[in-house]
Amino acid sequence: MASVALEDVAVNFTREEWALLGPCQKNLYKDVMQETIRNLDCVGMKWKDQNIEDQYRYPRKNLRCRMLERFVESKDGTQCGETSSQIQDSIVTKNTLPGVGPYESRMSGEVIMGHSSLNCYIRVGAGHKPYEYHECGEKPDTHKQRGKAFSYHNSLQTHERLHTGKKPYNCKECGKSFSSLGNLQRHMAVQRGDGPYKCKLCGKAFFWPSLLHMHERTHTGEKPYECKQCSKAFSFYSSYLRHERTHTGEKLYECKQCSKAFPDYSSCLRHERTHTGKKPYTCKQCGKAFSASTSLRRHETTHTDEKPYACQQCGKAFHHLGSFQRHMVMHTRDGPHKCKICGKGFDCPSSLKSHERTHTGEKLYECKQCGKALSHSSSFRRHMTMHTGDGPHKCKICGKAFVYPSVFQRHEKTHTAEKPYKCKQCGKAYRISSSLRRHETTHTGEKPYKCKCGKAFIDFYSFQNHKTTHAGEKPYECKECGKAFSCFQYLSQHRRTHTGEKPYECNTCKKAFSHFGNLKVHERIHSGEKPYECKECGKAFSWLTCFLRHERIHMREKPYECQQCGKAFTHSRFLQGHEKTHTGENPYECKECGKAFASLSSLHRHKKTHWKKTHTGENPYGCKECGKAFASLSSLHRHKKTH
């Protein structure tokens, strides 16, 4: 029923070994292999005609004698046992190649490298597999195969690593780990650029067409593996299997310290490093260490100008495939799954369903603590951490917890002075790469995200927040004063006006702020930096909002109109302050004298003129020309005009 294929009885030379063979030895090897093919054909085996020299010039594994555990059907239904007896009977002692080995098969013509290799040869021919992995048999619900068996002990060891997750072979170049020597060798060949199969887009080389085909999916976006439950598609089978576990809830790997379970070993290993603090992957250029190899590779691109993923429509290039794919969606929206309402296209049905909720307003996930409903499970999980504060990544300095390690790492930098991301044009440094990218747009003037009203934005998040001003939707309401906000971040920032919390402190003057953005702007007072310059009149500004307000003076643009009296304003805050003149609302009260104000900025100005001047006599704003001091910045500005 099953018998030996050509690859099961073939001798594989390494690249170095093949180069050492002389012309006579190579010809002899070809003759032996051709005789093997003829013998297999005679006994009814299926085989593929291949160029033998090409096949062994690029060996599949760097082993002297490799016996595959793969069997093919016999043409005439020959029993496996009969074939094995033929093979065993045909073994004779014969020294054909000096120094190679005394055993040769008459049937196949294969030179066997010693007695242990001969035993291996017989095992493969007979289908004998003495090494069995019992874990597969003990867990029939987890594994489809029961008691999987192998012909060689090293094959058993390689298989066991699938269960243990052990990866003993490390790449010295990038630190990536592998479960088998063959996988490491293949990886190193890709790093060296070896292999006959080259990618036409990025030049990466591969030994096998199958690996090249898999790699090409990273460029084409092809996703052949689709989940039957939710229709989500994946480029690689391993990613598809990991995803399936999210539906079954299967979590095989448990953290020894906190007992948290994970669907795959690599996730468990990354999680364990949050307990140990281990960061085995170090950047050779700046010495920065990372807990995951993917984080290191992402970081390394910040040192180079390499951006391998280029958009063919606008020419914009990206360091990472994920960023490139997100960018392409903004251009095309031409996926096969189209929205019937707005015509947008999506790659998979699950993305379309998620998008359709933005039209229907359907919110499947409701928070039991505050009653808030959300459209997506990911948004719901993020929201829940606001209540519990039980994210796995906790800050040792302030105790704040985070769900995602990337967000946690960004937060850690707020406590340190570390700023690894530098602008090449002006030398300004930033804690996170996204801040650097935003800053770089101040030099280029690029605003890729455009609203239908004509307004353009530097980043997608600001663009999304702006769109809510048109919709008028403000689902996030403050329980203290009833004020509503279009996004949760604005509500969180607003809450600090009631609690008085100021977690961000200036290292120069120790002044504290409730928002990180305010701290950044304040620091410009010390540095004198004014990155936003008007192209019309050359006036420079420390704040982007001030710069945008100033620009509207030239354009005479007033997009914010009062619905009661029709008065228009250049900024939404001015409109909000104006609207309170109609309602008479003064929600901001001075704790010192009880005076109430319509806007928070008015209260702050009052505190400086009333509280500081009356109670302390402090006038913090001094004129550099004459030395006169003022209680408020606006008074100083007015005074400066006299000079």
From Swiss-Prot:
The keyword Magnesium does not apply. InterPro entries: KRAB, KRAB_dom_sf, Znf_C2H2_sf, Znf_C2H2_type. One of its GO terms (molecular function) is DNA-binding transcription factor activity, RNA polymerase II-specific. Its main location: nucleus. GO terms for biological process: regulation of transcription by RNA polymerase II. It holds the Pfam family KRAB. A zinc finger (C2H2-type) spans 134-163, 169-191, 197-219, 225-247, 253-275, 281-303, 309-331, 337-359, 365-387, 393-415, 421-443, 449-470, 476-498, 504-526, 532-554, 560-582, 588-615, 621-643. Residues 4-86 form the KRAB domain. Belongs to the krueppel C2H2-type zinc-finger protein family. May be involved in transcriptional regulation. This is Zinc finger protein 799.
